[in-house]
Amino acid sequence: MELFVWRQILKNLILPPTGPLLLAIAGLALTVITRVRRTGIVLCAGGLATLWALATPVIADHLVRAAERYPALDLRRPLAAQAVVILAGGVRVDAPEYGSSAPNATTLERVTYGARVARATGLPVLVSGGRYEAQAMQESLQRDFGITPRWVESHSHDTRENALLSAAILARDGVQKVVLVTSAAHMERARLEFSDAGIASVPAPAALWTRREYGLLGLVPNPDALLRSQRALYEALGLLEHRVRIMLVSPTAARGAVVPATQPASPQGPPTEHSPPKAAPAA
């Protein structure tokens, strides 16, 4: 099984709802099976209380707001960038109403805003994601927004590979700075990965948090709030993983192994798909 799959399994076991539920189950087991009743009760109550808190809109939105570190991009100001890069966030495989794969809600938010940025700036577009994600993004941009991506990166599995493989493609056309489009909570991690890959970026966050008035409903758990908490904590785990990796591995060495020497820019043409470089496997 690929390392990527094991990493996703581990993250899902830590994140809500699974993490707090496992904590509560462990506490219940200690209470019933062993004599450590006090510790078991504390763990069980702590797991259930954590799950309740993370499912409330007030807590969820505080976590999301903390994860979003960049304001909305002002498209009226000139941007010193050479391309727009849109990152995938999931896909609906074989969506029956489209007759093919289609972007999920997260990816569609990014694609919609990426199209707006591309139109406002006139910059060429690169879409980056897995095989189905990249294809769905390309088709959506063409069908729904009349924009044909110049580059398609369709081999990445995570944000790090988004950055490494996109950097390798962009370097062939001499692109060193991009407008980076992704979800607001994901932007910090995405920018760090692109910086490590040798690409400077202007943040163009999509789906920014907006202030809400809750009243008592803000303290009542709901599935949407739990999902927002999960996404915010997922990004916190991703940033922690990035920091640990940077401490263990030289980012300069990683860049040199992946990004090829810059080549003269190619003329405008149909979207091109590139195979991933073979020199540096993902961590």
State the predicted function of each range.
Residues 1-31:
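Membrane-embedded alpha-helical segments of integral membrane proteins
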Residues 224-253:
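Structured C-terminal subdomain patch of bacterial secreted/periplasmic proteins
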Residues 32-40:
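Membrane-interface helix-boundary motifs at transmembrane edges
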Residues 19-26, 43-53, 233, 237:
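Lipid-exposed faces of alpha-helical membrane segments in multi-pass integral membrane proteins
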Residues 48, 53-225, 229, 248:
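A structural signal for short, hydrophobic/glycine-enriched beta-strand patches
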Residues 253-283:
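Compositionally biased, proline/threonine/alanine/serine-rich low-complexity intrinsically disordered stretches
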Residues 2-10, 59, 63-67, 233-240:
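Hydrophobic alpha-helical segments of integral membrane proteins
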